[in-house]
C-alpha cells in the first residue's frame, strides 16, 4: 500500500522572472540551464569559501519559473544568502504556502497535483496550491529514513557553512553538482576538491537497534586498538521503531572493517552500504 506523508518540515519557494534561470545558474552548484523542464535535482548554495549554507530540491518548470524545497530550520539564513544579489536581476523569491506531500509507492490516479517531482522509482513529492483529497497514512520520520537510506543528505543549523558539497556526497547524487558549467559562488573550492583531491571527507550511513536518539552536529566514536576516540559529525539522525538511522561525515578513507559506536554507548553501529559510488 502506498504511503502518503505530509512534509511539514519543508518550505516551498517559487523563483520566477525573466532572469530566474541566469540568476540561479550563477548561485547554485547544479547546471540550471541544462536541467530539463519538468526535471528535479538536489542542489546546493555555497558561501564564497565553498561551504554549504543550504541544500535545496530544485524543480524547473521553465527558464522563468522554478520551485525550491528547503528545510524550514535553515530557511531564513539560507534564503537570505541565495537572494542576496537578486536586487540586480529580474527575479523574485516568494514563499508559497502550498501542500507538500511525500508519496512512497504508487500515486493514486484520482490525485492530480499542480506538480509532481519524481525522486526515484518509488518516491515522489506532490506540490499543490490547495489541499488535495489525500488520506495521510505515514509519519514524516518514514520519509526522513528513506532519505537517509537513499544517501540524500540533510543540512541543519548545526551543520550550515561547515561542509563543502562533496563532503555530503553531492557529486554522486542526481545532477547536484556540475563541474563543466561557468562560475558560481564557491565554485573554486568545489572544483579544487575534485581536480586536486582536496576533499578528504564523505558521508556514510549507519544504523543501530536502540531507543536512543542522536544529536545532529555531535560525534560518534571509532575504535583504535583497545581505545575509542571521537570522530565524524552526525548530519542526519532519525529513530524509527527502535532503529536509529544516521548519516555521518567522516574521513573518506575509513577501513571497511573499522568499528564505530555512539558516544557513551557500548552498542556497535552497523555500517550500511551507500546506494551509489562516491569515487570521483
Swiss-Prot record:
Entries under Gene3D superfamilies matching the protein: 2.40.30.160, Aminomethyltransferase beta-barrel domains
One GO biological process term: iron-sulfur cluster assembly
InterPro entries the record matches: GCV_T_N, GcvT/YgfZ_C, YgfZ/GcvT, YgfZ/GcvT_CS, YgfZ_barrel
Protein name: Uncharacterized protein HI_0466
Protein family per UniProt: To E.coli YgfZ (UP14) and B.aphidicola (subsp. Acyrthosiphon pisum) BU435.
Pfam families, per database record: GCV_T, YgfZ_barrel
Residues passing through the membrane, by range: none
